[in-house]
């Protein structure tokens, strides 16, 4: 009988990161997927990154994950979103060639040390004494294991809707999983339904691009991965069009035929990625909605019209598309659809992503109520790391709100839960100025090195980068000019007769890296504008970062105050019954987590701290 230490079920974005992370830690790992050729499949939009999402990708890369490196092998349109705003909200994004992305992912995983891939379908999980024993395949065979990571995406009782038509599926042409849904229900997990959707796909050869707006990418693509020196993939343009009043009329006239508005769908859809039906209803005063025409590949004429996700009948979809400028004669290759699926209340898992009910069972991705490739991948890498560390009897790996967007996401999910698909935003992070895309490796790579999940190659690159940062920082502190010379150059500085270093100049409004290079041409020789940009940001926002660090220190002190597992909140007399019940249900692990539970008052937190000091003064936490 086959036996593995860790088995990952599902080969989507969460699954591939989970499997690779577990394998990197030297643990024999098996990835079970319905179609190995679809590893890392982009089921919806052909793009990676975006605002906040791009930071997640950089954080995954910092821990030696796959997503950033793979998109650099397949990215055909790179664009830094929000670049005209502050660096805390910059969002690196890349349009992908779907085929190249899957090909690169497949090549990496099929040659990954300590990782095997099995074509198959898991029907059940064998559990004894609330511990994982094995997975059972649909052919009746059993594979023994210590840990299981469920990354089922939209496959748990998945149901596609196109108008009144219902198709049982995890995605187009792939069977759903009913067995695992039943298993989770029998265990006692709280399941609910969510919904997501995708737009119709259209033939780019039939688009009149003269009626659209050109959207070029960045002149020089900025790679996602620290392992990528330069993006060698050919770059192409995207285009923008918009809906019209006629489009909106057709949608309104047919709302009763939409699966979303006929009452056919139970699941709640993503608030921040609404269907075109939702947009017309919720924003009824808007006369138009933008549509981004995104190519799906270099040698693929399929276009993804981002912005018109729909569950309307096929004939209605054809009608509404014809009313969009440039798409009057377009050929529809595949209709859009909505899909609903089961998910588990994420308050059923801990911050390690292990379930509270079953030891050794981890959940990652859409099964936890999230939406998006990047959110799934971020959970996958943490679940994979922790499953492997548990096999090795090592301490768990936990990111926090203070050091990563991944930590923010996991804390939000495990503390508050979600009743709609959870998407990452910069606004969710209190410390977003410190948690930028450009410093992800400086925040997380050393943490990954400490637990052994980072390769030797990445270690060398990271060590060299840290050395270069110190060298360039020293140079920027050495290069200087008098205030009088700077004034002659048109740079507004106080005429106090002092010398101003480059780091001083970076603090001046509207002064940037390009100006510094113009004044001090030797900075060109550093040949690393990424480091110059990093140091520019750190200098420009130094005072804000210092204040934010004080907030982070306070947060970390509360996170370090652990709450014993066996604490009885009903024995703390100064706390109301309502709060006692909430704390007992949530089981917070630290004072910081307890403070973030809705309805927990500052007075209650003080009472807990006093109780812990008197009851557990010996440091006991059992």
Swiss-Prot record:
Coiled coil: none annotated. SUPFAM superfamilies: FAD/NAD(P)-binding domain (SSF51905). FAD binds at residues 10-15, 122, 177, 366. NAD(+) binds at residues 269-283. The keyword Protein biosynthesis does not apply. GO terms for molecular function: flavin adenine dinucleotide binding. Keywords: Cytoplasm, FAD, Flavoprotein, NAD, tRNA processing. GO terms for cellular component: cytosol. The keyword Manganese does not apply. Its cofactor is FAD. GO terms for biological process: tRNA methylation; tRNA wobble uridine modification. It is found in: Cytoplasm. NAD-binding protein involved in the addition of a carboxymethylaminomethyl (cmnm) group at the wobble position (U34) of certain tRNAs, forming tRNA-cmnm(5)s(2)U34. Homodimer. Heterotetramer of two MnmE and two MnmG subunits. Belongs to the MnmG family. This is tRNA uridine 5-carboxymethylaminomethyl modification enzyme MnmG.
């Amino acid at each position: 009988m086959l036996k593995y230490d860790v088995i990952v079920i599902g080969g989507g974005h969460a699954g591939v990161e989970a499997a690779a992370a577990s394998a990197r830690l030297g643990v024999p790992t098996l990835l079970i997927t319905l179609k190995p050729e679809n590893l890392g499949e982009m089921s919806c939009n052909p793009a990676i990154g975006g605002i906040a999402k791009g930071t997640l990708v950089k954080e995954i890369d910092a821990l030696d994950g796959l997503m950033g490196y793979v998109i650099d092998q397949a990215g055909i349109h790179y664009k830094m979103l929000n670049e005209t705003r502050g660096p805390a909200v910059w969002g690196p994004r890349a349009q992908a060639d779907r085929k190249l992305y899957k090909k690169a992912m497949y090549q990496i995983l099929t040659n990954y040390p300590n990782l095997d891939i099995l074509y198959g379908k898991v029907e059940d999980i064998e559990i004894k004494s609330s511990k994982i024993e094995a997975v059972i395949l649909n052919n009746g065979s059993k594979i023994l294991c210590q840990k299981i990571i469920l990354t089922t995406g939209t496959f748990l009782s998945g149901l596609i809707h196109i108008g009144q038509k219902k198709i049982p599926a995890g995605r187009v042409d792939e069977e759903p999983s009913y067995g695992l849904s039943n298993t989770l229900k029998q265990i006692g997990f709280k399941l609910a339904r969510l919904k997501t959707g995708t737009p119709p796909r259209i033939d780019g050869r039939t688009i009149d691009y003269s009626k659209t707006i050109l959207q070029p990418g960045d002149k020089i693509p900025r790679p996602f991965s620290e392992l990528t020196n330069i993006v060698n993939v050919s770059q192409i343009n995207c285009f923008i069009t918009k809906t019209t009043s006629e489009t909106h009329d057709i949608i309104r006239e047919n709302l009763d035929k939409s699966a979303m508005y006929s009452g056919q769908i139970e699941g709640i859809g993503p608030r921040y990625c609404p269907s075109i039906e939702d947009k017309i209803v919720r924003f009824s005063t808007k006369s138009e909605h933008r549509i981004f025409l995104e190519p799906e590949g270099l040698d693929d004429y399929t276009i993804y019209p981002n912005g018109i996700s729909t569950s309307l009948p096929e004939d209605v979809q054809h009608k509404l598309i014809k009313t969009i400028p440039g798409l009057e004669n377009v050929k529809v290759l595949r209709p859009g659809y909505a899909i609903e699926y089961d998910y588990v209340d994420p308050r059923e898992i801990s911050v390690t992503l292990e379930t509270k009910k079953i030891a050794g069972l981890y959940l990652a991705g859409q099964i936890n109520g999230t939406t998006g490739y990047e959110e799934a991948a971020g959970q996958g890498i943490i679940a994979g790391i922790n499953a492997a560390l548990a096999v090795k009897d090592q301490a768990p790996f936990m990111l926090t709100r203070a050091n990563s967007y991944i930590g923010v996401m996991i804390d939000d999910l495990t503390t508050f839960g979600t009743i709609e698909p959870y998407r990452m935003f910069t606004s969710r992070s209190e410390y977003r100025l410190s948690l930028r895309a450009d410093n992800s490796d400086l925040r997380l790579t050393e943490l990954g090195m400490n637990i052994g999940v980072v390769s030797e190659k990445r270690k060398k690159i990271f060590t060299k980068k840290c050395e270069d940062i110190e060298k360039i920082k020293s140079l920027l502190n050495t290069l200087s000019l008098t205030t009088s010379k700077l004034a002659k150059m048109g740079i507004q500085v106080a005429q106090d007769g002092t010398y101003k270093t480059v780091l001083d100049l970076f603090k001046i409004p509207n002064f940037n890296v390009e100006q510094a290079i113009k004044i001090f041409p030797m900075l060109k020789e550093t040949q690393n504008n990424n480091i110059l940009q990093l140091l520019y940001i750190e200098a420009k926002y130094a005072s804000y970062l210092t204040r934010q660090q004080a907030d982070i220190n306070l947060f970390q002190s509360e996170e370090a105050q652990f709450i014993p597992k066996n604490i009885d909140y009903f024995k703390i007399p100064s706390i109301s019954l309502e709060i006692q019940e909430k704390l007992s249900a949530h089981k917070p692990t630290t004072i910081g987590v307890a403070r973030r539970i809705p309805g927990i008052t500052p007075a209650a937190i003080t009472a807990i701290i006093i109780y812990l000091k008197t009851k557990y003064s010996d440091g006991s936490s059992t």
